[in-house]
Design a protein with these regions (language model features):
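Hydrophobic/small/kink-forming positions within alpha-helical transmembrane segments
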Residues: 39, 43-47, 151-159
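Symmetry-related core transmembrane helices of the 12-TM Major Facilitator Superfamily/SLC fold
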Residues: 67-74, 171-187
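A membrane-interface helix-boundary motif in multi-pass transporters
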Residues: 60-66, 159-178
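C-terminal ends and interior cores of transmembrane alpha-helices
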Residues: 72-87, 188-191
């Protein structure tokens, strides 16, 4: 959304809070709202994902995480059809979907992580590296490399997504739909 939807982040709410605060301090109230609404949409996405997890925790036919991924796919698919005159609504919807992703997928291989941002992963990886340097614990090194691997994959995806968004425009978000669908299908296969 930053590249094709008026320079507003959907996954990095810290950036939106910084930019919103700057505009508030400058007295530019309308521009500040431009950054506030995606933050609120993100918060609402966390609430909805948490509610889905609680409500469908014991569902037998489909795992609650698959429900969240299917909702994300539908949201992102719709956003790809939205013209740029609806950038604020599109950014809010993507923020909502990103929040659902972050709330739903909080661990990988037993380690807590953030799927749509890097700061927590960088902190955890570097903390583990420090433990390895200090105590020579091989498990700490594995953990550090795990987090740095997540950051590398994130960076490759972000870079590819940025290039695609510059080349394809708002429709580049549909690539995310394909990747999410593949992930959902892998989750179904894993359950069987």
């Amino acid at each position: 959304t930053y590249n094709v939807r008026n320079g507003v982040f959907s996954n990095a709410q810290t950036g939106n809070v910084v930019l919103m605060s700057q505009h508030l301090m400058e007295g530019n109230w309308m521009r500040a709202l431009h950054y506030l609404f995606p933050v609120l949409a993100f918060a609402f996405g966390v609430l909805v994902a948490e509610r889905i997890g609680h409500t469908y925790k014991n569902a037998r036919k489909i795992h609650w995480r698959q429900i969240v991924v299917l909702i994300e796919i539908l949201i992102l698919l719709a956003v790809g059809f939205m013209p740029q005159k609806f950038n604020m609504a599109a950014t809010m919807l993507v923020s909502f979907a990103c929040a659902m992703q972050v709330q739903t997928f909080r661990k990988v291989n037993g380690y807590g992580y953030a799927s749509t941002m890097c700061i927590g992963n960088l902190r955890s990886g570097t903390e583990s590296l420090s433990v390895y340097i200090r105590e020579r614990q091989k498990g700490a090194l594995r953990k550090a490399l795990h987090y740095y691997g997540i950051i590398l994959i994130f960076a490759v995806g972000a870079g590819a997504g940025g290039i695609c968004s510059m080349q394809i425009g708002v429709h580049a978000i549909w690539i995310s739909c394909v990747l999410l669908l593949a992930g959902c299908l892998l989750m179904i296969k894993e359950e069987r």
